[in-house]
Amino acid sequence: MAAALVRRFCRGSSFPVSGHGYRMLSTVENVSESGKSMNLYSAINQALHIALETDPRSYVFGEDVGFGGVFRCTTGLAERFGKSRVFNTPLCEQGIVGFGIGLAAMGNRVIAEIQFADYIFPAFDQIVNEAAKFRYRSGNQFNCGGLTIRAPYGAVGHGGHYHSQSPEAFFCHVPGIKVVIPRSPREAKGLLLSSIRDPNPVVFFEPKWLYRQAVEDVPEDDYMIPLSEAEVMREGSDITLVGWGAQLTIMEQACLDAENEGISCELIDLKTLIPWDKEIVETSVRKTGRLLISHEAPVTGGFGAEIAATIVERCFLRLEAPVSRVCGLDTPFPLVFEPFYMPTKNKILDAIRSTVNY
């Protein structure tokens, strides 16, 4: 059995990127004329089709992925590429990730799906103590850099405390992995392809609230968006706002309302949380003198605290006000009281006003 698995999955250890028609988009490049209007889940699906098509050593697996997945992100993959490359797994997250580590260590590209980010915790040991440290503890003789773990995360309006959590901060404390969160269909496709082809393990969180809500023109060809490069979504002079994922939609609405009050807001999408783009945030804060960070996860120990600490270290004498955080509450994610838990537009707008008027 073991020998058969080795023969099936061992494909060598190199990860060629050039020569396959890939193109790297800058974070500000315009969508090509060949772009097609699609939502976020369709963009994810298209990226997975491209990943499997361009590399015969790539595999997709997880709970119900053979049927298209609960959010339909893997629709059509099993029919097109066969059940030997796209297949279902038992309901066992540590097994899904552990199997993915083994496949990646044998030179394959692995896209392992955790059905909901809330259930990634049974795989925590595999991600933190195995995937993240595999290269280091072997003295770079072995690695599982071909592993990408996809997981839908965040509020959805009716998920409650088992289907709404944002666990990104748990993984941002771990050297050896990357954490990526897209905000839109175009970003999702390019960032997912970059994550799959990156030589390091990546945890790729997908904001499920945007799966069908976010729609825009997306290039249909094979392209990648660089990891660890933040994007200034809108320029401003009075205050810098930093966020990621679905929360950026709420933050942008707050920026528009603040602009009506004469407050100029600069909005930055981190895209990659680890390693994050410190320079672009620092440059912005040195210009505006103020910083507000917003995320859905609870405020205490959230990744916003790391951003705040870093910017205070780098920009202390340029700050005009304390760094502000507008985040989820320090409570289990509630079902009925979700609107009170969430960092809403009005909460962000109030924080903008108080920070600017400090």
Curated annotation (Swiss-Prot):
- Xref: Gene3D superfamilies: 3.40.50.920, 3.40.50.970
Reaction equation(s) it catalyzes: N(6)-[(R)-lipoyl]-L-lysyl-[protein] + 3-methyl-2-oxobutanoate + H(+) = N(6)-[(R)-S(8)-2-methylpropanoyldihydrolipoyl]-L-lysyl-[protein] + CO2
- Summarize tissue expression: Expressed in the non-photosynthetic organs such as siliques, flowers and roots.
What is this protein for, i.e. what is its function?
The branched-chain alpha-keto dehydrogenase complex catalyzes the overall conversion of alpha-keto acids to acyl-CoA and CO(2). It contains multiple copies of three enzymatic components: branched-chain alpha-keto acid decarboxylase (E1), lipoamide acyltransferase (E2) and lipoamide dehydrogenase (E3). Required during sugar starvation and acts under the control of a sugar-sensing mechanism involving Ser/Thr kinases and phosphatases.
**Positions contributing to thiamine diphosphate binding:** 119
Q: Which SUPFAM superfamilies match?
A: Thiamin diphosphate-binding fold (THDP-binding), TK C-terminal domain-like
Q: Which cofactor does it need?
A: thiamine diphosphate
Q: Name one GO cellular component term.
A: mitochondrial matrix
The entry's keywords: Metal-binding, Mitochondrion, Oxidoreductase, Potassium, Transit peptide
Record-linked Pfam families: Transket_pyr, Transketolase_C
Which InterPro entries does UniProt cross-reference here? Answer: THDP-binding, Transketo_C/PFOR_II, Transketolase-like_Pyr-bd, Transketolase_C
Q: How does it assemble?
A: Heterotetramer of alpha and beta chains.
The Gene Ontology biological process annotation of the record reads: branched-chain amino acid catabolic process; cellular response to sucrose starvation; response to absence of light; response to sucrose
Q: Where in the cell is it found?
A: Mitochondrion matrix
**Gene Ontology molecular function, alphabetical:** 3-methyl-2-oxobutanoate dehydrogenase (2-methylpropanoyl-transferring) activity; metal ion binding
The top EC class is oxidoreductase
Primary location recorded for the protein, binned into one broad class: mitochondrion
Annotated EC: 1.2.4.4
| Binding-site list for K(+) | 145, 147-148, 198, 200
This protein is called 2-oxoisovalerate dehydrogenase subunit beta 2, mitochondrial
Tell me which species this is from.
Arabidopsis thaliana (Mouse-ear cress)
* Induction of expression: By dark treatment. Down-regulated by sucrose in a hexokinase dependent manner. Up-regulated by Leucine and its derivative alpha-keto acid (KIC).
Which positions form the organelle transit peptide? 1-16
